[in-house]
Amino acid sequence: MSQNDTNHESVEEAVFKYVGVGLEKSGEDDAVNKQKSVDWFLKEQDQDQDQDQDPGRDQDQEDNAKHRDANDVSAVAAAAVAAALSVKKRGRPSEQSSTGSSGKGSGSSGQNNKKSKKNKNKLHLAAVDPELASLDDNLVDGNDSEEQSHHQLVHKAIMDTDNIASQHPDFQQYLNTEDDQEPKKEKSEERSYGDLSNIDDHVDDVSVSGSIPSQVRLKKTAEVLPKVLSSESHNDDQQDDVSNLIQEAAAKASHIINPATQSNGKSFDESEEEALEQFIKEYQKIRGLSRRQICERIWSNERRKDDFWTNICRVLPYRTRSSIYKHVRRKYHIFEQRGKWTPEEDAELARWCAEKEGQWSNIGKVLGRMPEDCRDRWRNYVKCGPNRAANKWSVEEEEKLKNVIHQMLDNASTAYEDGEDDEMKDSSTKIEDSGDADMLDVQDSDKKPSISNSKKKPAAKDIINWTVVSEQMGGSRSRIQCRYKWNKLLKKEALNKIKNISDDDKFWLLTKLRDMGFTEDSQVDWEELSTLMPGRRWTGTELKLLYEKVRTTVRQYKRKTINVICKELVGYPEASLPLDDEIRQHHSGDDEDKD
């Protein structure tokens, strides 16, 4: 076997053993490894110098190569990888110098493509380790296919090693700290050189410039390389563990709620408060957050890929996401006060709204109050200023209010017939809820199912923009005053109409409510329900008032669900109910208007 074959087998063996199982033994005995590596390097240098003088020593070199152990091979590969890292960090000076020398030596114009490709490969090997590029110098074009196959395999392994080293952050960290620790490296090298005091000077110089720096890095490199294979999977496992803990906390908190007594009402009961509180405390422990930090997380406007809102909604799965979102933000707010507004605060709110009306998040931060509180205070009380009347509504004001709202409803009806209702509703919502979009980043995915599959006409409550109504009233009444007054007028009119409702219509309503299986009054869309009645003789408001009056005849109706109440009422003979006296009594109690 020739010297070239020996060198090829050594590089191949070194690369694969270093990347594979050979690395496991690299740290067992550092002192022995260092000495063996140094001895081997010096021995190879002597063989290179004496090769031309004594060709008969090839057989001895071949025998010596067969006895080379795994640690020697690991040292060679470590030197190759360390050299590649150093060259990559410093801008590959070896590649530049190799390119320059190659250009000088190949000045003939008759160089073919095959030789040019071969030189490029040698240059890349020189970038990994300058010593590797010289291994092909003695190869001839007549090499057999097996030798070329080995050469290509070694070349690919070296390229893969270089890519791994350049891409992984742990190697980059190792390189970044290499220059900062130069004094420590010099001391470490001096300790390694102490064992070479009996070596000839010219051999010692070669050793210091070549093998020793690679050996000094061997241990550090051996400690870094395993992270290439395990760091990413370790981080993924850690994230999965945290996510599992949070999901378990949500499931545990949800068990506090009794499914038989769960409520869809507007207010959260004590058990729901307890369940939410328990989950948030567990989330704080898992994430290591303080009370202030969890409040800041809840009020963060950033759209994070976070598991907080997803899991807290699992605690109360029967509630909408937006209701949980708003409730939690109100309880875990980051603002200083939520008490009664003082005249000074109203004046400051007016000053800020004159500049930034609609930017409720910014205004809330300045005033130290929740954005929703600032918005409602401005729209309902402060906006009208001294023009807002606080006395009883006059007949002229009532008529003006009716005209404004009827005109708005007529415009909406025309837009609906022309197919423009979606645009109209979007515009109304944009005006009414201006400033809310920057506070709400949780969308409802559990909307109530529609009673009918057909496209429904928008209800009056979805059309009327009370801010616009207040403005068209000349600012003499706030939006909340206009809304309360309108609802009171509708109720008075509806109570007068349902005095003459037939028993058939009453029976139809109760049967429909019973069959739909509602458990809470808030689940009923009364306007949509009215569209299902044949002939549509009654509005949603009138049907709601009818049910509210009929249910009072059931004992302890406040403790029963709407489904149970309707089952009892349908069982009454001919659904005959004493409505007239109750309606007349209720109507007399509404004669006194309140602002």
Swiss-Prot record:
Q: Biased composition, Polar residues: where in the chain?
A: 163-176
Against SUPFAM superfamilies, the record matches this protein to: Homeodomain-like (SSF46689)
Q: Which residues bind DNA?
A: 360-382
> Is the Phosphoprotein keyword given for this protein?
yes
Give the PROSITE patterns listed for this entry. Answer: HTH_MYB, MYB_LIKE
Localisation per UniProt entry: Nucleus
According to the UniProt entry, the coiled-coil residues are: none
Q: Please list the residue ranges annotated as the Myb-like domain.
A: 385-490
Biased composition annotated in UniProt, kind: Acidic residues: 434-443
- Keywords from the UniProt entry: DNA-binding, Nucleus, Phosphoprotein, Repeat, Transcription, Transcription regulation
- What is the stated purpose of this protein? DNA-binding protein that recognizes sites within both the enhancer and the promoter of rRNA transcription, as well as upstream of many genes transcribed by RNA polymerase II. It is essential for cell growth. May stimulate or inhibit transcription. Specifically recognizes the sequence 5'-CCGGGTA-3' or 5'-CGGGTRR-3' (where R is any purine).
- What is the protein name for this chain? DNA-binding protein REB1
Query: Gene of origin?
Result: REB1
